[in-house]
């Protein structure tokens, strides 16, 4: 998602050919066609079933690692794949605004470490962008929510994205955004729910036919797309039908998969994933020296938080109803635009005080990290 500032207000920039949520969502998917053409975003996602071996998804979890993607006998780093997504976002934004874009504020999960943050900056450079600031996603969401809010509030931001989960507790006081604590899990998100649903469907098919669809890339991608679609539908309905004709064929003939999903069954399957979110939430409150229920406002961020079962679980964990006037899909990009406006001097009287999510230290003999509380900032220190 990308946004810019117009008249002091953040505005979402739609992707050029996007169909996801009216073009206001940009899938971080990169693919290479048989002819070697590179496609990014919605077009890449749409062709994934027919070209799974040359389609890259979920690269965010690999940022800052030595992981390499092998496509058509060429190796790509996570930074290079991420840069391809940023290049497409940059091109769409330039086409929409009619100006060249050279600088950007980029958001990252709050619990990203230094390697992951530097990798994000490197991706921006490869894409032709000077990264003016890296800002934590929950903090950006709070900026979007609290820009025009007067008074003093303590806010908990729960950000459940596709691949990561972050919890940030902050104080908002008439334009001052002071982060008290942050916690998270960089390997927990909506993707894990999709995987759980895929496993459920694959196990059903295997039980009936003796075939594991997970062993076939194309069949697995069809399962994933169907699971994701059902998950979204069941946020608004109580029943969804998965119908995948000709998902397999062998000497005995074609085989189909049809299954009626209820919201109750969905909640049962994804429940263990949601339960894992409780630990980072408790840690954030512990670091803030607060108890659940002490906060005045709760903001939910990220696509999976549109699910009623996620909303109910998070409200139970925190002990307070979530705010309903926040768009969980767009507020992070809008917050990044606000931060860009602050840096450019277009927005006044906004002060952001964030913390280090991880402890800083020095490596001593034997590859041991030594933390010096007198000279080096410790975990949860304001910077």
Name what the model sees in each region.
Residues 1-65, 69-75, 84, 91-377, ...:
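Oxyanion-binding/catalytic loops of NTP- or PPi-dependent enzymes
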């Amino acid at each position: 998602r990308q946004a810019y500032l117009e008249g002091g207000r953040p505005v979402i920039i739609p992707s050029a050919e996007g169909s996801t949520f009216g073009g206001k969502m940009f899938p971080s998917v990169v693919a290479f066609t048989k002819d070697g053409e590179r496609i990014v975003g919605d077009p890449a996602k749409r062709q994934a079933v027919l070209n799974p071996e040359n389609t890259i998804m979920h690269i965010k979890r690999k940022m800052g690692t030595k992981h390499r993607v092998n496509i058509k006998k060429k190796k790509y780093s996570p930074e290079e794949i991420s840069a391809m997504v940023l290049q497409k976002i940059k091109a769409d934004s330039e086409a929409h605004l009619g100006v060249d874009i050279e600088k950007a504020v980029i958001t990252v999960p709050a619990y990203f470490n230094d390697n992951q943050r530097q990798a994000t900056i490197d991706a921006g450079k490869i894409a032709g962008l000077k990264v003016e600031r890296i800002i934590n996603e929950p903090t950006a969401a709070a900026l979007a929510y609290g820009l025009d809010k007067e008074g003093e509030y303590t806010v908990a931001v729960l950000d459940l994205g596709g691949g990561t989960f972050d919890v940030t507790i902050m104080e908002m006081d008439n334009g001052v955004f002071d982060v008290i604590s942050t916690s998270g899990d960089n390997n927990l998100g909506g993707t894990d729910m999709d995987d759980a649903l895929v496993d459920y469907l694959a196990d059903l098919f295997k039980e009936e036919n003796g075939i594991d669809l997970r062993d076939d890339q194309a069949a697995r991608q069809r399962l994933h797309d169907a699971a994701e679609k059902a998950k979204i539908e069941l946020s608004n309905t109580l029943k969804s039908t998965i119908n995948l004709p000709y998902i397999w064929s062998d000497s005995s003939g074609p085989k189909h998969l049809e299954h009626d999903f209820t919201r109750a069954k969905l909640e049962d399957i994804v429940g263990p994933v949601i339960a894992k979110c409780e630990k980072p939430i408790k840690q954030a409150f512990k670091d803030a020296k607060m108890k659940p229920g002490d906060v005045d406002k709760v903001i939910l961020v990220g696509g999976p938080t549109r699910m009623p079962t996620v909303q109910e679980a998070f409200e139970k964990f925190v002990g307070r109803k979530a705010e309903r006037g926040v768009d969980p899909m767009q507020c992070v990009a809008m917050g990044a635009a606000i931060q860009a406006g602050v840096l450019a001097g277009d927005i006044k009287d906004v002060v952001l005080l964030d913390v280090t999510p991880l402890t800083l230290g020095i490596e001593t003999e034997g590859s041991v990290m030594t933390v010096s509380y007198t000279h080096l900032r410790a975990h949860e220190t304001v910077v």
